[in-house]
Amino acid sequence: MGLRAAPSSAAAAAAEVEQRRSPGLCPPPLELLLLLLFSLGLLHAGDCQQPAQCRIQKCTTDFVSLTSHLNSAVDGFDSEFCKALRAYAGCTQRTSKACRGNLVYHSAVLGISDLMSQRNCSKDGPTSSTNPEVTHDPCNYHSHAGAREHRRGDQNPPSYLFCGLFGDPHLRTFKDNFQTCKVEGAWPLIDNNYLSVQVTNVPVVPGSSATATNKITIIFKAHHECTDQKVYQAVTDDLPAAFVDGTTSGGDSDAKSLRIVERESGHYVEMHARYIGTTVFVRQVGRYLTLAIRMPEDLAMSYEESQDLQLCVNGCPLSERIDDGQGQVSAILGHSLPRTSLVQAWPGYTLETANTQCHEKMPVKDIYFQSCVFDLLTTGDANFTAAAHSALEDVEALHPRKERWHIFPSSGNGTPRGGSDLSVSLGLTCLILIVFL
């Protein structure tokens, strides 16, 4: 019974690895080959029990064990996946004589060849080992996290959290709560035992409580042999591709357990901290900065009581939130804005024109679309449209759960929502008025 059950779980794990690599795309030929392989395994599991001792089932099970915890959104995926593929290929070679004529074996060999071609894996190079003690890398979070799970018999991959800040400013917390806040001045987004992130927000327009981010400071704390403390700082019109000490990486020069990658000069950089499994995106859109972070839950929640003021963890203080709790306001989408100084300040933007401009970039009318409309009406700055769009792109790149990418303000089916933090469909007008009080 054990041999017959294994391929089924293997198929699910292999499919999950492919889905993480290309979310939302049609299954590639490779996945179909793997599914065919595992289906054949279900039908012919008995083939591996013949006196010749074909061990293709063991090779396949080991490969699934080595790859089921990997995630393509995290730095180092390709390297680890190729190592596992080479180990899989080596295993099939060692059992080739015993598996001659076995359809499952030959399907596996074909699948491995296609996988290595699609992933651009070289045939020569390091391989993964099914013994986690051998492959343990203290400066690769995914390596030692996977080893711990393997020892415990836990096949669930590490849990990751996402936090983002953009626009006027809009905060998405680790709990997927969505808030619009004032938070003028310097505020900590994250302050745990591994990472500190602080943002500084300044007023956007005179007479308004709306602010936006013009400075970001990130401290990667020293981590024994993996990296010395590294500080990154970005301000408006100065988005460097290096830490403040002039370096672009931390730790061993070959391993690069911490590194900066410049994607668009002066506008977009990424920081990959392999030793803590963390990825940070920093962008400048218009005059202001945006931030997106993906971090393992066990590390993100590792902090002392004195570090409880973290916007990514607990959200903005109530006194700093711009919410719709100031009165009973009916849904205003499709209605006209009241005649206020806001309309006089930016006559080019009405609710209708703001909706139209935001819809061009974001066809799904989720909370990011609503934030875009809100920012246009409160600031008159068209760059906030691009900021909301890039923030959504960062969610799609870093958020671990695809079903939570879009947050809908009026959702009643369990979809994450801003709740009392921001219910845009019930309060855009009220929010705009509050900003200018």
Curated annotation (Swiss-Prot):
One of its GO terms (molecular function) is identical protein binding. Residues 121-153 are annotated as: Disordered. Disulfide bonds join 139-226, 163-312. Glycans are attached at residues 120, 383. Its main location: membrane. GPI-anchored. One of its GO terms (cellular component) is side of membrane. It comes from the Eukaryota. Residues 121-133 have a biased composition (Polar residues). Changing residue 186 to R: Severely impairs interaction with NEO1. One of its GO terms (biological process) is BMP signaling pathway. It is a lipid-anchor; GPI-anchor. Member of the repulsive guidance molecule (RGM) family that contributes to the patterning of the developing nervous system. Acts as a bone morphogenetic protein (BMP) coreceptor that potentiates BMP signaling. Promotes neuronal adhesion. May inhibit neurite outgrowth. Homooligomer. Interacts with DRGX. Interacts with BMP2 and BMP4. Interacts with the BMP type I receptors ACVR1, BMPR1A and BMPR1B and with the BMP type II receptor ACVR2B. The functional complex with its receptor NEO1/neogenin appears to be a heterotetramer with a 2:2 stoichiometry, RGM molecules acting as staples that bring two NEO1 receptors together without interacting themselves, this arrangement leads to activation of downstream signaling via RhoA. This is Repulsive guidance molecule B.
